[in-house]
Amino acid sequence: MASQSSKPQSIYDFTVKDAKGNDVDLSIYKGKVLIIVNVASQCGLTNSNYTDLTEIYKKYKDQGLEILAFPCNQFGGQEPGSIEESIQNMVCTRFKAEYPIFDKVDVNGDNAAPLYKFLKSSKGGFFGDSIKWNFSKFLVDKEGNVVDRYSPTTTPASMEKDIKKLLGVA
């Protein structure tokens, strides 16, 4: 977590929990372009988003793209099971996701994860300060700055131009 004495400057100032409850310092992603997304396994957007996320990850992981997926049960109770059930049954088996899936978080409200408070404060604007639904996406540059925010209905494939620009891929 970011220290209480200083305001976080980038996502690298945060530590989150992985799916097994271990601390992960996000500074390990320095130099990577990131898509940070809140996910759910029982949402109408699940199939298209996980399929697209997996495709875009396979296409650009070797150029420095990482996807950080955070399960969330705040929207229609669409991520109800344990994190282990969700990951094993849905993400890894069905969608063959190779990118990291983290511990379940709240993205809105008093108990929102500090990372999500930072993401929302960095890119609120048109979207306001709250996450509207599952599969809201944040694009982060190689320095850990939040560059853009995409709605749940924006497909990962339609983010490709922005991703390529940050990766420096022609």
Curated annotation (Swiss-Prot):
E.C. designation(s): 1.11.1.12
Its annotated compartments are: Cytoplasm
Gene3D superfamilies cross-referenced by the UniProt entry: Glutaredoxin
List UniProt keywords, sorted A-Z.
Cytoplasm, Oxidoreductase, Peroxidase
- Report the source organism: Gossypium hirsutum (Upland cotton)
Q: Which family does it belong to?
A: Belongs to the glutathione peroxidase family.
PANTHER family cross-referenced by the UniProt entry: GLUTATHIONE PEROXIDASE, PHOSPHOLIPID HYDROPEROXIDE GLUTATHIONE PEROXIDASE-RELATED
Protein's name in the database? Probable phospholipid hydroperoxide glutathione peroxidase
Q: What does this protein do?
A: Protects cells and enzymes from oxidative damage, by catalyzing the reduction of hydrogen peroxide, lipid peroxides and organic hydroperoxide, by glutathione.
Q: Name the catalytic site residues.
A: C43
One protein family per Pfam: GSHPx
